[in-house]
Amino acid sequence: MGTLTGAGIAVALPAGWEGRIFSREPDLIPTPLRPSAATTTTTTGAIAHLANFALPPDMGDFGSVAVDMMTGPDLLVVLFEHGSEGLGTPLFAASGLPTLSPDDFSPFTLRKLLDGQSGVQRFFTLSGRPFCLYVVLGSHLRRVRTTPVVNEVIRGISVQ
């Protein structure tokens, strides 16, 4: 088991898992009152990609490219930090990392429907930071066996 750290996030990875943690640069957007003036706003913070298969170098924030490669036993966990404008909103009202059940997973939760796969998405606040947890299972039929593995990975996440 190794520990992955970055951007105020630490993850204790089980054997056979790999991951990466990175942050996006803040976006420059025009201010509403002075459209010609750009201001820096963070719309995305840290992103963690965790998987029990080799992650491609060019995958999207929510696993595009990686999900196309997934087979039945493969699991992908994405922790995506939203901008501070999400704090205090109903979407991020839940506090702390979620614990998932097999019934939480649905093929229709996926950002891209792929035969046999299923996913779940949960929004929450942890350590004063708004997050989305997005999990993809390579096989919806194996969800009873694989959900405990996913929960082990989630329990290994800590945020400062």
Name the predicted role of every residue range.
Residues 1-4, 134-136:
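Short, compositionally biased strand/turn segments
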Residues 2-8, 16, 111-121:
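Generic detector of contiguous secondary-structure segments
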Residues 60-144, 151:
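Signature of long, low-cysteine stretches enriched in small and polar/charged residues
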Residues 23, 144-146:
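A short, polar/proline- and glycine-enriched secondary-structure boundary/capping micro-motif
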Residues 3-90:
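Secretory pathway targeting signatures of secreted, lumenal, and periplasmic proteins
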